[in-house]
Amino acid sequence: MGFLKFCRIYPIVFLLIIFTDMKAQVNNKDNLMIGAEIFIEPGQSDYNVEGWFNTLLENNMEITRIRMFENYMKNEHGGWDFRLFDRAFSYAEKYHIKVYANLFPATDFTDVGGFKFPADEEHLNRIADYVKNVVIHFKEFSSLYGWVPINEPGGGNMNDPLAQKLYNTWLKEQNAKIEKDKLTDYHHPSFDHEKFLRYYNTWYLKWLTDEIRKYDSVNPVHVNNHAIFNLASQYDFPAWRTFLSSLGGSAHASWHFGFFTRRKYALAMSANSEILRSGAGNIPWFMTELQGGNNIYSGIEPMCPTKEEIGQWLWITIGAGSKGAIYWCLNPRASGSEAGEWAMVDFQNRPTDRLMEAGRIGTVLKEHQQLFSVAKPLNSKIHVVHVKESMWVENRLARDSSKDEIRLPGAVMKSALSYFEAFSYMGLQPSLEELGEFDFYHSSYQGHTMVLSHQIAIPVKYHDKLRYFVRKGGRLMIDGLTGYYDENAICIMINDFPLKDLFGGSVSEFKYMGNLFSLQIDGENLPTYALKGSIHPQSDSHNQVQKIICSDDHKIYGLINDYGEGNVVWIPSPIGLGARIADNYKPFIEFLQRHIDLSDAIRFEPFLDNVMMKTLKSGDEYITIVINKSDSEKTVKIMAPFALRNPAMLFSNGTAFIKNNLLEIGSEEIAVIHWNTH
């Protein structure tokens, strides 16, 4: 297969290769589809398998995903025997269900999620043979919708022979690009491991996609990442766009939402979805796995979703632009560590209230197919940005045993999430994107706000891009240790801080304050966490205007620095993380409202704790999805910069009522409202 040659040329040509036949099959105007995964394993009766496909149909589900176990495709002589899966695909045809085939090469029975990388070249060749046989055989079924080349990439082992061989090749190429003087340049820790893991995830995913394309150039290729709040720095989504048809994800509350309490799982789903939407860019995205049922021994935080949560999670993904979702799972597997768990049918194969609730939503989507198929998320011009290098540096330096959250892995992401949460309670729809995904090529950023909250490492290559964003009218909001390190974990705030012109000064010092303390900003006390940074203002301001917004004892703790046509709001203390840890967003939100112009945004007035809204635009019509996670009924005033007329309730799971722009909505309720502007 010319493996080593391919390894050498791949890094050079990878970003230049765009396969035109990959993007034509799934587009951003496709109808929305919902479904549930049917788990196929030996021992299932013909009656039950057919019944599951019929159950999907009866509950307005159009799509399923099937895990294509190689272990269940070989007879006692080692020959291929596809009968178990042929039956499933045939019933899918009978009941008009589309199938995403999830490739799952042979692995140990206890390997629940599948291996993430091949062990060696011989293993890679076996995988290639498996892909060839499965794709050639199952592409003949009309029920085949597309391929998932690997289940939940990310977090794999890099100690195997193949990984080491690729790593050595990759490292030589990286070192050839680096010019370094050992006597004058700062020494720093190596982040080659993190960089290579990101590269390797992409390499293997593209290799699998290329193997599929040898035998099927038509059907879509889609993948579901997972644990996005922990593994985001491993995923090179812009590179994936060049060969995938669509992007997906697994968002299981019991596995992946450890940064959140259960009340805030809807918020977690919203943040997860926005990360995927940003990652997908110009290709569609589709939530590949949503938790559908109960945990007993699996998961980290065991739970059984309520029917209300099932509906909330689905509507949130739709509000973030997903072309639908598949629940894991319709039927429970009978064996293994997840036996009897996760299902949307009961042990007698009857629909649970969770399945019926998803089916109700499916009915609404079918009845309003045209409205939803062309609907796009209406972003609030607020960009909450996380930085992969910040996650790398934090993971390297953090103390897992620390009792202080600021010193634990995750503070970087939680800081970004704190702003996302605050904006969500204002009824806004912020984006949540990696710095490398942000579009720095517009001629104007008037009305746009970028948030860099405790993003501790900012690569030097972005310094001028951030200057450009602000100079062209953008507002940059910075808190915590943002910009403390460069991409090599070198502290750039000591001596001559390279961003002092943009930020409005340099940090004089940080003081560790323990747990929560207060900063008085604009005359109001804000909960702040752990670190207090004082500012030495820029003396040579080049006619820049600075406004002090936080000071005491002759020290400055916060300022606004005008720069070009925009400005920077800088508070070098973790005020976002402070609001999150205190679970007191009121003063923080009031601070944000003073410094961000929201007059052109659809929003709540006033803000509402634990209430959120996603907004879609479909032609000249609008759809608002409001979810009340508080413990009481709320009156929600929906404001817009233009007249929203003729509100009509498309879906409610309770007694929600809308009149003009006032919505009455009970605890745990969902209200999906259709508006027009004429």
Q: Each predicted region: which residue ranges?
A:
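A short, well-structured beta->alpha microelement
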Residues: F420-S443
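A conserved amphipathic helix/loop scaffold
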Residues: S453-H678
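Short, acidic/polar
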Residues: G43-L57, I127-V135, F229-W240, T306-L314
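Polysaccharide-binding and catalytic clefts of secreted carbohydrate-active enzymes
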Residues: P118, D129, N133, H137-I275
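N-terminal carbohydrate-binding accessory modules
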Residues: M22-I63, L371-V374
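Aromatic-lined substrate-binding rim segments of carbohydrate-active enzymes
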Residues: V49-N125, K132, Y199-Y215
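The substrate-binding groove and active-site-proximal loops of carbohydrate-active enzymes
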Residues: I34-Q44, F69-F82, V112-R126, P153-G154, ...
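Hydrophobic targeting/anchoring helices
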Residues: H222-N225, N230-M413, F510-G514, I521, ...
